[in-house]
Amino acid sequence: RKMEENKIYICLENGNVFEGKSFGAKGEVIGELVFTTGMGGYIETLTDPSYFGQIVMQTFPLIGNYGFIEEDKESEKSFVSAYIVREWCEEPSNFRCEKGLDDYLKENNIIGVYGVDTREITKTIREAGVMNAIITSNPATVDYGKLKAYKVKDAVKSVSCTKPYMSASQEHKYNVVLI
């Protein structure tokens, strides 16, 4: 299946604007832009609670080649605000694959951006430090004052468990209780 390619923009609080293409959910989002250098483990990254309120960018050039596998998740849901990659694989190849990255992002209302120079954006963040960004289809309407003022709020409350849960083992040897 061939996707319709829609232009989307990453606008950094320092005024830099990067044009890319949209995948995953549609919309607009503000977040703290960070990058990760992992060569794999994108499922774990997407479901890592420490990325709450952040727009996560992968520096590895191709993401999504083994699809999405529920068993590999770090938590029950995704906490990233948006996801940026250089290139993503539309048709993953893995016997464990349950769905593609695009489908996962859509199901979890996460905006994805691909087709941008992640090296240049990473260099900007490395030199200037972590900064806020907005992903939008209309960069002319960005309120840079609002963008600079953005702060991640209620992170701990938002990622903490609200009820007890049990993690079962396939080879049960001991009973462990955490209080």
Question: Locations of the language-model features?
Answer:
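RNA-binding accessory domains that recognize and position tRNA/RNA substrates
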Residues: 2-179
